[in-house]
Amino acid sequence: MQDARRAGIAIVAMVRSSDNLTTRALRIIPDRLIVHNEIIQNEASSLYGMKAERITVVGIPHYDKYFRGPTVPRESFFRKIGLDPRKKLVIYFPICDYRMRENVVDRMVIETLANLDANVVVRFPPAESVTIAGLVKPPAMIFDRPGYVFDERIYGNRELTPEDDERLLHLLAYCDLVVAGPSTAAIDAALFDKPLLLVDFYPTTLAEAEKIYEYGTEHFSPILASGGARRAKSRDEFLSRLHEYLTHPELDHAGRARIVEEQCWRADGRSSQRVVAELLAALGHEGA
């Protein structure tokens, strides 16, 4: 972007995630900015002084394929990856080490979920560490570790494959509950109208600075305010919410719809087309 600016070449940039403008600094102001939703549009204006006419809201392009829905029937998919089609499915997206001074949560949650009479899939992040040292994987639980590894010697040197994303699509479509921390998994769950239980409890008493920090950030506050997710602050509350959601998945449907409306802007599967239209317009091909 710096080289382009010096060379007089127009710059079209895109904000890729909801936290990019508040937890990071936009060091170069592009000529045009593509964003997912009006929340990020307002951040670009209020925090960086960008004029509204230079910002285009398109929705979330990555979700376009999700509106197609699953291509493999539930029973076939479950059997293919080793799940019991007779039981419900819970997906756990780990907190990850970087969200805490010391990750004491992920192991505790996995051990708690292992006692459920349900299928449990732990969907690890492709490029972040999750400390569960010494944990023996429960026999009825699947550890899904997505990502193509480019270099085993360099942690995080990996990327999701189309097959990884296709598997996630099917897991989300067929699951009955999503358990997660303050991550984009919250939007994933809402998009598929799946109950979302947020983990915010700990095995020992911790100071606030040692807890999961992102619950207090600006980008996650709309999720908490939506009414579309429940935040468990004790193990008893966590277990109670688990069983409540598995029994009544319709709970908090309106709040999840609000998350989709605010975060996805247009849930119509055409976000990628809007990105292409913006790029063509920048090239002077309006209406192409």
What spans do the regions from the language model cover?
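Acidic donor-binding loop of glycosyltransferase active sites
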Residues: 157-164, 169-183
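Conserved catalytic-core segment of nucleotide-activated headgroup transferases in glycan assembly
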Residues: 63-158, 232, 264-267, 271
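C-terminal alpha-helical cap of glycosyltransferases
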Residues: 268-288
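Hydrophobic beta-strand scaffold residues
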Residues: 9-11, 120, 196
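Flexible glycine/serine/alanine-rich "lid" or loop that lines and gates the nucleotide-sugar donor pocket
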Residues: 6, 173-174, 191
